[in-house]
Swiss-Prot record:
An annotated Gene Ontology molecular function: amino acid binding
Positions bound to carbamoyl phosphate: R51, T52, R101, H129, Q132, G258, P259
Entry EC number(s): 2.1.3.2
UniProt-annotated binding residues for L-aspartate: K79, R165, R220
Pathway(s) of this molecule: Pyrimidine metabolism; UMP biosynthesis via de novo pathway; (S)-dihydroorotate from bicarbonate: step 2/3
Protein family membership: Belongs to the aspartate/ornithine carbamoyltransferase superfamily. ATCase family.
Gene3D superfamilies, per database record: Aspartate/ornithine carbamoyltransferase
Subunit note: Heterododecamer (2C3:3R2) of six catalytic PyrB chains organized as two trimers (C3), and six regulatory PyrI chains organized as three dimers (R2).
Catalytic activity of the protein: carbamoyl phosphate + L-aspartate = N-carbamoyl-L-aspartate + phosphate + H(+)
Protein known as: Aspartate carbamoyltransferase catalytic subunit
Length: 305
């Protein structure tokens, strides 16, 4: 089977999510080690990244692929070359998969139009971040006792939803898995599509706990993407939308895609608390992204056959 682009989780159903996470569990157990031998994976990261970039590289290497890393500073994009021309170049040089991180929403979909290689969306501006949502589901499912136990779990997505590509992937993925969701954000940080999602909108972390949330999915306040004043002040924002130690008394699990701004969306002493799934989310990155690379290159189907 040939290349399969991996751009979004919109339209992905519960069965498809289960299959991907089962494959990730197999990858974690080592069943895909060396399976990408002879394949070339290009990591084209044109926006800053730590967790996503490192875990994709570790995943590709663990699966046996040859890995090429490209950044804006080290590529002809710094000389004015377009994204399309860069992608075509990587494709013609023989990349089997192009893992793309880009500051513009829709960049991965654009790249996929011009590449025969599989394009994997590693985050495109305020657009999508599908592999993050998958590793979040993987981590949460393990914490509740398995994928089937996700049905009926109540989770609140808290913070800067407007600028969050993670939220735009987490929301459809969690809903497809049966998780009940609510949004917790000031009106100035809600996107237009929030009305289409049809989810309850709450005004504080305290209200989310009253709603019955057992999971608080915290989002970073993305001040670098803001074009104007969206909140009165960081202190005022944290008063309503930050999770502190007192919230842990309700027995909630805390999640965050990273990077964490300690003291803004999460109190510093909560990040590594036993109630925090953040370390588990990071650890899940290699297995989940190994599964995505195996699916994108067609190797997973070949091994299964």
């Amino acid at each position: 089977m040939g290349a399969r682009d991996f751009l979004t989780l919109e339209g992905c159903d519960r069965g498809e999510l289960r299959e991907i996470l089962e494959l990730a569990a197999g990858c974690e157990a080592g069943r895909m080690d060396g399976a990408l031998a002879g394949k070339t994976v290009c990591l084209a990261f044109f926006e800053a990244s730590t967790r996503t970039a490192v875990s994709f590289e570790l995943a590709a290497r663990r699966c046996g692929a040859d890995v090429i890393s490209l950044s804006e500073r080290g590529s002809s994009i710094s000389k004015g070359e377009s994204l399309v021309d860069t992608v075509v170049t990587l494709d013609r040089l023989g990349a089997d998969a192009i893992v793309l991180r880009h500051p513009a929403a829709g960049a991965a979909r654009l790249a996929a139009r011009f590449a025969a290689a599989a394009v994997v969306n590693a985050g495109d501006g305020c657009g999508q971040h599908p592999t993050q949502a998958l590793l979040d589901l993987y981590s949460l499912s393990r914490s509740v006792g398995g994928f089937e136990e996700l049905a009926g779990v109540r989770a609140a997505v808290v913070g800067d939803i407007l600028h969050s590509r993670v939220a735009r992937s987490v929301i459809p993925a969690f809903r497809a898995a049966g998780v009940e969701l609510a949004l917790v954000a000031p009106r100035t940080l809600l996107p237009v599509e929030a009305g289409v999602w049809g989810l309850p909108v709450l005004s504080s972390v305290d209200e989310a706990l009253e709603w019955g949330a057992s999971v608080l999915y915290m989002l970073r306040l993305q001040r670098e993407r803001m074009t104007g004043a969206r909140v009165p002040s960081v202190a005022e924002y944290a008063r309503y939308y930050a999770v502190g130690r007192r919230h842990l008394e309700a027995g909630v699990r805390v999640m965050h895609p990273g990077p964490v701004n300690r003291g803004v969306e999460i109190a510093g002493d909560v990040v590594l608390d036993g109630a925090s799934l953040i370390p588990d989310q990071v650890a899940a990155g290699v297995a989940v992204r190994s599964a995505v690379l195996a699916l994108a290159t067609g190797v997973a189907q070949e091994v299964a056959a």
